[in-house]
Amino acid sequence: MKGSSEHGETSKQAPLGSSRGVSKGVSVLDLILRFIAIIGTLASAIAMGTTNETLPFFTQFIRFKAQYSDLPTLTFFVVANSIVCAYLTLSLPLSIVHIIRSRAKYSRLLLVVLDAAMLALVTPGASAAAAIVYLAHKGNVRANWLAICQQFDSFCERISGCLIGSFGAMVMLVLLLLLSAIALARR
């Protein structure tokens, strides 16, 4: 059967240039997500670290003061966000190298491990701070802890706002891990 041809699916491989374009796009998105996470962690650490409020009590000589450093959980929050921000800043050059050399495998694997470690650091910091913020707003009747946000309202508003940047950075780190996994799987 000289003239017969086989009918069915044919496989066409994508041109090599489009694969590089996708890898470069993933690397650019990686860099953008790192910048967003840096902004979130830096803003959270600075805002929490500068949070305090003083209330006068009967006279101007007796005052009640609320600071982030009064609660070790909020101090851990500031330290964790600062460490993650420093790491993300130091990882920017490596992310830029991935844009230039999209085939870099071991450096991307290193970023996956370190990104996972930073996610493991920022998650308990943000979660513990969220628990303290909840207690500050609602209190706990069974433990006889009163809600302090009725008196220290600007303090509570500020520490509540700090959580947004930290939880946003958590989401960015998860997306960075997914992007790195996609980039490594394409090799």
UniProtKB/Swiss-Prot annotation:
Residues 1-20 are annotated as: Disordered. The lineage of its organism: Eukaryota, Viridiplantae, Streptophyta, Embryophyta, Tracheophyta. Homodimer and heterodimers. Its main location: membrane. This is Casparian strip membrane protein 1. Keywords: Cell membrane, Cell wall biogenesis/degradation, Glycoprotein, Membrane, Transmembrane, Transmembrane helix. GO terms for biological process: cell wall organization. One of its GO terms (cellular component) is plasma membrane. NCBIfam families: A_tha_TIGR01569 (TIGR01569). It is a multi-pass membrane protein. InterPro entries: CASP/CASPL, CASP_dom, CASPL. Glycans are attached at residue 52. Residues 1-10 have a biased composition (Basic and acidic residues).
